[in-house]
Amino acid sequence: MIRVLHSVSNMDRAGIETMLMNYYRHMDREKVQFDFLCNKTKPGAYDSEIESLGGRIFRTPGLNPIKYPKYLAYMKELFRKYPEYKIVEAHNGALGVYALHAAKLNNIENRIFHAHGASITKDWKLPLKLICKSRLKANINYQYSCGIAAAECYFGKDTVVNGDFELIPNAIEVEKFLFNSDTRNKLRSKYNLKNKHVVGHVGRFMAQKNHTFLLDVFAEYAKTDADARLVLLGDGKLMNSIKSKAKELSIADKILFVGNVGNANEWYSAFDLFVLPSIWEGLPVVGVEAQAADLPCIFSTAVTKEIGLS
């Protein structure tokens, strides 16, 4: 059996992690197994399912550069204890070089960087991320990407022109997202959304997803439509500040914060419109899911045109 070690933040319900689970559930796990190298100590929503499917979950000391020697020692012991690993695939942006460099030092043959974002978040970690990005090519021998824009961001335009990378589509289980009128009626009844015009968004509460702008736009729309409602799925460190902004804009009574739930697929049937105002994306899984539900979609210009499905 081949075991692939995936470096991730943690296995919560987010785009990258959900994409991995979509593949994991449907592959022949007698031949290939996925294991997950998580860089956060917090348990993930998918942990129990992963273990039930035969996967392993490891938790590193984290990606603090001050603790890098400790990280390398952890990885050295992991590879000593589990010598079967021949493939390491990193999904956590430029910081994925941590796992890939450790893999190279321990003579792991196949080291894959999987690009998911078309930009690098400009936060306080930006200098570290840029250093890590500059070290990627020295530590990998395979380049994967969810789309062209993400490939250009991490590998450069020449790599894209020369086709020197593998395009891995963000696949979904289409049947789970098809429109269902019974599901629509159930959710809209439960959450007092009957006869309302429901705008939906699915995404982690972080700067990239641009919730602040979304609320500003919705506040203007709500002035013209008393039945307008905004439903937000997801959680994250900015949720409380977004709730405060909703109160400031006097639209808190028109917004439903659903949280991080296991039935996000059902919510697409309850929406009338899907919006994704992200500042940057690779090829967002939620955009594919919304189109599978036959929803009208509004994407920001930062979202790659590759997202458009016929």
Task: Report the location of each language-model feature.
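N-terminal strand-loop element at the rim of the active site
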Residues: 2, 6-70, 164, 237-238
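Aromatic "clamp/platform" in nucleotide-sugar-dependent glycosyltransferases that forms part
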Residues: 260, 279
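A short helix/loop element that forms part of the nucleotide-sugar donor recognition site in Leloir-type
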Residues: 75, 178-192
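A short, active-site helix/loop in glycosyltransferases that binds the activated sugar's phosphate group
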Residues: 140-179
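Nucleotide-activated donor-binding/catalytic signature segment of Leloir-type glycosyltransferases, i.e.
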Residues: 243-259
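Short His-centered aromatic/hydrophobic patch
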Residues: 90-96, 115
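A conserved mid-protein helix/loop that constitutes part of the nucleotide-sugar donor-binding site
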Residues: 14-22, 197, 201-220, 237-243
